[in-house]
Structure formats: C-alpha cells, structure tokens
C-alpha cells in the first residue's frame, strides 16, 4: 500500500487539517500518517484558539513516522512558525522525501489567520525548493509575490514568478476569482489550465487541505503531476457538490462521496 504523510494542523470539527487529509487519503486507498503542527479549537464558523506544537515535538512526530514507515508522498498544510518550518525541512531532507505538496496555508476559510508574518518567507526559502508542487490560492499568491491578481493573465504571471523563484511547480488555484474555479499549473516554463465550474455551495470548509492531500495521494499512486491534479480536482468537485449541511457556518465536504 502507498503511504502519504500529512504535516498539518488539527481541526477539532473534522472538516479541515489532518482530519480532512486522512479522510481524503482513505478515499484514495492510500495509508495516511500525520505529524500535528497545532491543535485548533475550530468549527464551521471560525477558529477560536490555536495551540502550537513545539518544534521539537513536531520533529519527533516526523522522525517517529519516517524512521519506521517510509512515505511515497507528503503534504504540508498549516505551519504557524518559522521554527517549525526549519524542523520540517531538516526531517524531510534527512529522509529524502519525494512528491512533496505544500499548501501555504495562511488564512482559514473563515478568515482566521493561521501563520505568523515571518513564516511565509522562511517557507518559501526552505520548503518550496524541495517541493514537487505548491498550491497557493489567489490571496496567498498575492501575499507571496506582492502582485495583484484579477485575471487569468495575472494568475499566469504570479505562478511563473513563484515557480521561477522556487524552482518547483506551482498550481495557482482560481477558486477565489470572480470568473470561475479554474486553476493554472506552471511547470518547466509551461502553463496548463484545469478548467472548473464554480459550484454554488456554502459548504466549502477544508477545500484547500482536501485538494493538496488528494494531489499527494495521486502522486503516491504513481500519477504524473498533471494527471494527479486532474484526478484531485475531479474528486474535490464531487466532494463539494455533495457538501454536508452541518454547523452554522461553512460546512464540510463529503470526503466519502465516491465510496
């Protein structure tokens, strides 16, 4: 069985973070492991508190996993501090982890901040260069590049800038665009667009976590990056369309929609 490691935060309501990752991995028939970066008191309406794992304990979790069970892919989600980023880089480099998918989580669906101001720069310097692909949304790409993104051409420009600076592939997600839900992949100087219809649903809690873990799962299964993204987008579209009407805010996806 293929193995995927998720390095991310815990969502007490189960819709995002490692809980969404494990559900997604199970739906893809891969074995999921986790290293928890933070505990969040969170529900469909927002994040009320965050308790970070110490960098040392985060490192111990990754060491415990990878020293015993090698992984075929990994995904990184919420990393609140630069110190955590450094530990993650050290461990992933030590174990030569391949097929790394980095979702540079800065803000929750509800709007709550999940990353300290200096962390993004350290992440870009240490983790992006060892990644197979990074998956920023439009607000995250704007924060990382300083560019304003209002069109497809702007998306291509931002993805190209991020890709050239980091040396990895970039999947810039267009779900925050006013146009549609299409995403653009920049890899090796080429753009590939993945067209997607906007699904009218208020139940979108954990979409970024789910997409990145679906991509990692498909990479672990041996699919090339464009195919892994295509399959992941098909999965998440189904999961959003079947979204669960739970809670008072943005409800979760149905991760088991195809099972």
What are the language-model segments listed below?
Residues 7-13, 191-205:
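Short pre-catalytic strand/loop immediately N-terminal to key active-site residues, enriched for Gly-Thr
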Residues 19, 142-143, 201-225:
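Short, small-residue alpha-helix embedded
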Residues 29-33, 192, 218-231:
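Phosphate-handling active-site elements
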Residues 86-95, 168, 182, 190, ...:
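Nucleotide and nucleotide-moiety/phosphate-recognizing core
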Residues 1-6, 25-109:
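Conserved N-terminal subdomain of the carbohydrate kinase-like
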């Amino acid at each position: 069985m293929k193995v995927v490691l998720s390095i991310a935060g815990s969502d007490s309501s189960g819709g995002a973070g490692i809980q969404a990752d494990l559900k997604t991995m199970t739906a893809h028939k891969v074995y999921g492991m986790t290293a928890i970066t933070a505990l969040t008191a969170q529900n469909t309406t927002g994040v009320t508190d965050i308790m970070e794992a110490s960098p040392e304990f985060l490192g111990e979790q990754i060491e415990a996993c990878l020293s015993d069970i090698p992984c075929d892919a990994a995904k990184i989600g919420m990393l609140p501090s630069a110190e955590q980023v450094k530990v993650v880089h050290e461990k992933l480099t030590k174990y030569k982890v391949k097929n790394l998918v980095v979702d540079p989580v800065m803000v929750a669906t509800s709007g709550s901040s999940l990353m300290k101001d200096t962390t993004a720069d350290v992440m870009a310097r240490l983790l992006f260069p060892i990644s197979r692909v990074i998956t920023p949304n439009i607000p995250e790409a704007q924060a990382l590049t300083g560019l304003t993104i209002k069109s497809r051409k702007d998306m291509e420009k931002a993805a190209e800038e991020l890709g050239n600076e980091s040396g990895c592939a970039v999947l810039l997600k267009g779900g925050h665009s006013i146009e549609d839900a299409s995403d653009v992949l920049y890899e090796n100087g080429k753009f590939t667009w993945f067209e997607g219809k906007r699904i009218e649903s208020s139940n979108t809690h954990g979409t970024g976590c789910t997409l990145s873990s679906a991509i990692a799962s498909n990479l672990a299964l041996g699919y090339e990056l464009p195919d892994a993204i295509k399959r992941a987008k098909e999965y998440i579209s189904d999961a959003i369309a079947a979204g669960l009407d739970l809670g008072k805010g943005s409800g979760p996806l149905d991760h088991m929609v195809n099972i």
